[in-house]
A protein has these predicted regions:
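Loop/helix patches that line or flank the sugar-binding groove of alpha-linked glycan CAZymes
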Residues: 1-124, 130-135
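A broad, low-specificity signal marking well-ordered, structured residues that form hydrophobic/aromatic
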Residues: 33, 112, 125, 145, ...
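Short helix/strand-capping connector loops at secondary-structure junctions
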Residues: 59, 151-154
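Charged, E/D/K/R/S-rich low-complexity terminal regions of large eukaryotic assembly subunits
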Residues: 68, 142, 150, 169-170
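Short, flexible beta-strand-to-coil junctions
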Residues: 118-119, 151, 175
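Residues immediately flanking
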Residues: 129-130, 175
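Beta-strand-rich binding/interaction modules
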Residues: 134-152
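C-terminal beta-strand-rich structural cap/linker in extracellular carbohydrate-active enzymes
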Residues: 157-175
Length: 175
């Protein structure tokens, strides 16, 4: 953090410029904004007229209140993920991790897939498309239950042993 006394007591403009530049490099202020709670005044972050950091312009559309009211929001997706993790601790907390290769025996550059297997044998397959392209990913086995699918996939969608994932889409299901 910038030492105020050092900065204020420095008469040399070049030193002030150097101190300011180093502060900006190390500060996290340029990477965050006030939490956007509501679409109201100052995004519900403060009742004051002006927070010390500017509220993002999109606060009327993107805020916590808007997320909690939309069933297909990021908020509800992560709520579902955490509920499943809590309900299936033997798999997701204590289960063994294994990286899954595609059917050609190679690791797909666009897809990150892995299993979590409980001591009792229950297994979840998690498939994440980290690309901006649609991906058809083949898997061995049969899906018995879709746990989390932001894209709305069902067991029927997985019945052919192929998962069609949209850009940046993921799915978790029991096999």
């Amino acid at each position: 953090m910038l030492d105020d006394s050092l900065y204020k007591d420095t008469a040399d403009e070049e030193t002030k410029k150097y101190l300011r530049m180093n502060y900006q490099k190390k500060s996290r202020d340029n990477a965050r904004t006030p939490m956007q709670w509501t679409a109201g005044h100052q995004a519900g972050f403060t009742s004051g007229n002006e927070p010390w950091m500017r509220v993002n312009d999109n606060y009327t559309a993107i805020n916590a209140a808007a997320q909690t009211s939309k069933p297909d929001s990021v908020y509800h997706c992560w709520r579902q993920v955490l509920e499943k993790r809590k309900a299936l601790k033997d798999i997701f907390v204590y289960g063994d991790y294994a990286l899954v290769e595609d059917n050609e025996g190679t690791v797909n550059e666009k897809v990150y897939a892995y299993t979590r297997k409980a001591a009792g044998g229950e297994t979840a397959l998690i498939v994440c498309n980290f690309s901006i392209d649609k991906v058809a990913w083949k898997f061995d086995g049969k899906a018995s239950e879709v746990l989390v699918s932001p894209g709305g996939k069902t067991v029927k969608d997985l019945s052919a042993g192929v998962i069609n994932l949209g850009p940046c889409e993921a799915i978790a299901f029991l096999v």
